[in-house]
């Protein structure tokens, strides 16, 4: 069975591009949502292997780090990962309890694909 990914806050350009990558490379099913409330509702339904959160949510400009905090505080046992090229944002996400993520500049790198795959299989 493939990986199930919850993708939070990507824009209309990056979201479909990332979804296609995960589907092609990881045989993943990707659900895209646009807010922390949506993410929490989807997580409660279960079945996800990993949550990817954009640093800035495209729909309203809110902080992906705040989304990560909410998800972690909710008690989820699903690994949460920040999508950001900014090292300081990655550091803050890890401090909040997330797994160190990746930036879009390295999106198609084999190491990024492997990171998502290995994290989702934890």
Provide a role label for each language-model segment.
Residues 51-71:
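Conserved phosphotransfer microenvironments
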Residues 105-107:
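Hydrophobic/aromatic docking surface of two-component receiver
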Residues 95, 111-122:
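Receiver (REC) domain switch/output surface
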Residues 34-50, 56:
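Acidic, metal-coordinating helix/loop segments flanking the phosphotransfer/catalytic sites
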Residues 20-25, 92, 96:
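Alpha-helical interaction/dimerization surfaces of two-component signaling modules
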Residues 2-13, 18-22, 32, 51:
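Conserved acidic segment of CheY-like receiver
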Residues 84-102:
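Alpha4 helix (beta4-alpha4-beta5 surface) of REC/receiver domains from two-component response regulators
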Residues 44-46, 70-77, 96:
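Conserved phosphotransfer cores of two-component systems
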């Amino acid at each position: 069975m493939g990986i199930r990914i919850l993708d939070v806050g990507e824009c209309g350009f990056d979201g479909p591009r990332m979804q296609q990558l995960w589907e092609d490379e990881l045989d993943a099913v990707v659900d895209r949502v646009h807010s922390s409330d949506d993410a929490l509702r989807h997580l409660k339904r279960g079945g996800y292997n990993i949550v990817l959160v954009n640093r800035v949510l495209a729909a309203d400009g809110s902080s992906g780090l705040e989304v990560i905090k909410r998800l972690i505080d909710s008690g989820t046992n699903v690994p949460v990962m920040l999508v950001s090229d900014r090292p300081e944002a990655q550091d803050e996400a890890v401090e909040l309890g997330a797994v160190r993520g990746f930036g879009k500049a390295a999106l198609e790198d084999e190491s990024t694909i492997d990171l998502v795959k290995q994290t989702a299989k934890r």
